[in-house]
Amino acid sequence: MTSIRSASTPVEVRRLGTLDYTSAWQLQRETADARVAGGPDTLLLLEHPPVYTAGKRTEPHERPLDGTPVVDTDRGGKITWHGPGQLVGYPIIGLTEPLDVVNFVRRLEESLITVCAELGLHTERVEGRSGVWVPADDLRPARKIGAIGIRVSRATTLHGFALNCDCDLSAFSSIIPCGITDAGVTSLTAELGRRVTVDEVADRVAAAVCDALDGRLPVGHHETLNVG
């Protein structure tokens, strides 16, 4: 595979700790402006304080029933939760022409699938749905462990992915996460039976994302046909 990035210089990885969503969104826009002006591709890695964010396709009934505030965004997808114990990545990347947004998403998925495998967890894609999933078994439906929602403007990507490491999964119970009613949500900690922190996975994710974007990590076939 070849690189999907228009630049040949390495991706600049920035670990930001915990940053509120509004500040992170402003930083994304500033970083994207800099990239369009000739600056580097950048991967922002961080955690957010608890917040619900809604993509452009979110329906009213998918929002919190208790009136919890929601930040409306211009990314694709529907509503989700961000908070402590979840690694959020915002790749601000200049894409090659012609733009292939689906391929960009598949490369992000591949990076998260690879990191999960390194930690001992088998994950897959679900046909027709973005993100990374633990496949269904005899007792449970498929569970989403990694979410992806992006926007491309001026051939530059915004928003990105979220990997549930050691987060409070009960936060998802107030919404219909990603608009999906027939599947669950899980975390690395819940699936592996040990605490898996953001710090443990952040460097792995950074390396895998850079490898996937540059074509060193090819996109494999991880499809599962259904969620039930």
Swiss-Prot record:
Cellular compartments per GO CC: cytoplasm
CDD domains the record matches: LipB
Metabolic or biological pathway: Protein modification; protein lipoylation via endogenous pathway; protein N(6)-(lipoyl)lysine from octanoyl-[acyl-carrier-protein]: step 1/2
Annotated localization: Cytoplasm
Xref: Gene3D superfamilies: Bira Bifunctional Protein, Domain 2
Major localization listed first in the record, in broad terms: cytoplasm
Reaction it catalyzes: octanoyl-[ACP] + L-lysyl-[protein] = N(6)-octanoyl-L-lysyl-[protein] + holo-[ACP] + H(+)
Highest taxon of the lineage: Bacteria
InterPro entries given in the database record: aa-tRNA-synth_II/BPL/LPL, BPL_LPL_catalytic, Octanoyltransferase, Octanoyltransferase_CS
EC numbers, comma separated: 2.3.1.181
Pfam families per the UniProt record, alphabetical: LplA-B_cat
Keyword line: Acyltransferase, Cytoplasm, Transferase
Residue span, BPL/LPL catalytic domain: 37-217
General remark: In the reaction, the free carboxyl group of octanoic acid is attached via an amide linkage to the epsilon-amino group of a specific lysine residue of lipoyl domains of lipoate-dependent enzymes.
UniProt cross-references to NCBIfam families, sorted A to Z: lipB, PRK14345.1
Function in brief: Catalyzes the transfer of endogenously produced octanoic acid from octanoyl-acyl-carrier-protein onto the lipoyl domains of lipoate-dependent enzymes. Lipoyl-ACP can also act as a substrate although octanoyl-ACP is likely to be the physiological substrate.
Protein name, entry field: Octanoyltransferase
Organism: Mycolicibacterium smegmatis (strain ATCC 700084 / mc(2)155)
